[in-house]
Amino acid sequence: MPPKKNVVEEKPALIGRLGTNLKVGILGLPNVGKSTFFNVLTKSEAQAENFPFCTIDPNESRVAVQDDRFDWLVNHYKPASKVPAFLNVTDIAGLVKGASEGQGLGNAFLSHVSACDALFHLCRAFDDDDVTHVEGEVDPVRDLEIISNELFAKDLQFIDGPLDKVEKLFTRANDKTKKIEYDTLVRVKKCLEEKKPVRQELWNEKEIEILNKHLFLTAKPIVYLVNLSEKDYIRKKNKWLPKIKAWIDTNDAGAVLIPFSGAFELKLLDMPEDERQKYLKEQGVTSNLDKIVHTGYKALQLEYFFTSGEDEVKAWTIQVGTPAPKAAGRIHTDFEKGFIMAEVMKVADLIELGDEAKCKAGGKYRQQGKTYIVQDGDVIFFKFNAGAGLQAKKK
């Protein structure tokens, strides 16, 4: 049976800014370990004091995406320059109950959330008498509810403006071109009233275009991070983890949950490399920071391809689904304008076979045209019509 024509595929929405310079914000209540996490993640020294709102202006940094494939390419080509992919991370000040109504630092915090493209939602599952909890007792499920409710409340406040505007045009001015926009925003409001995140709804391409005009907070992808004590992280047990997982399954099905320990990571950060490796081996654990970075990168729908040679090995960030000419444009706009072809090797093939010559001999070095969709880990050699004094090839 032939496929139906003009059927718009429904898929999870990629809502928000399109591009490669996207960032993940670290979100949570005060004193749950956000600044400590940011410090160990970026190896920076952002202030981390034991009182609410010590992080007023968001600290921003970028974190290298650790990749064994990139390390292999660097070792193989021994380039003069090496540039990995990076994840942009922002430490947002602690959000408190009532922020949507101006409590704490209120709407200033929510504007920082709005400026991010995805979120690390960090909750605390450790007891420490020296680190007070803004709500008194430690209860990460309650904390998840507080943050979730504030995001829903802010979206509900926001939706009325654009919905009223398009409703006037559609129903009163009889502007039929506004029907899709009106129907989409009505559906968004229904989701919010039912406490269903916008990201959990299925949207078609046209609806996504409309949603991308707005910055709904509940549309942003979320990775849930649970900050454990060093002891619980090492023994891989904590009484709150099953309850947190149950909350996520009910309220944000399919979202990723990653346990980590700020205290554990901070301890590793202060150790020399040989001592660190010995300690990890003795405890039978590994750091989860690389996993967190990779998960945040994927949450932004980002991936990267490599250009490699003796001059430079570089990972170029693109959005998933990028065609070859647009990927070439990440290097220089002339590469996109004068695109001829992309000569592509899979990095896995290159690692397995050992060098480019063997990839070519084994039929693993392919010429791809304008319709080729670049895949994560492609090693690409672009050919283009030279312009603006550039060389005819870039690798």
Swiss-Prot record:
Domain spans labelled TGS: 301-384
Primary location recorded for the protein, binned into one broad class: cytoplasm
Domain OBG-type G: start-end pairs: 22-280
Top-level division of the source organism's lineage: Eukaryota
Pfam family, one: YchF-GTPase_C
Protein localization: Cytoplasm
SUPFAM superfamilies: P-loop containing nucleoside triphosphate hydrolases, TGS-like
Cofactor dependence: Mg(2+)
One GO BP annotation of this record: thermosensory behavior
Record: residues binding Mg(2+): S35, T55
Tissue: Expressed in the nervous system, pharyngeal muscles and intestine (at protein level).
GO annotation, cellular component aspect: cytoplasm; endoplasmic reticulum
UniProt-annotated binding residues for ATP: N31, V32, G33, K34, S35, T36, L228
A molecular function GO annotation: ATP binding
Keyword annotations of the record: ATP-binding, Cytoplasm, Hydrolase, Magnesium, Metal-binding, Nucleotide-binding
NCBIfam families in UniProt: redox-regulated ATPase YchF
Assembly information from the UniProt record: Monomer.
Classification via HAMAP family: YchF_OLA1_ATPase
Function: Hydrolyzes ATP, and can also hydrolyze GTP with lower efficiency. Has lower affinity for GTP. Plays a role in regulating starvation-induced thermotaxis responses in AFD thermosensory neurons.
Protein family (similarity comment): Belongs to the TRAFAC class OBG-HflX-like GTPase superfamily. OBG GTPase family. YchF/OLA1 subfamily.
Protein name: Obg-like ATPase 1
Species of the source: Caenorhabditis elegans
Record gene name: ola-1
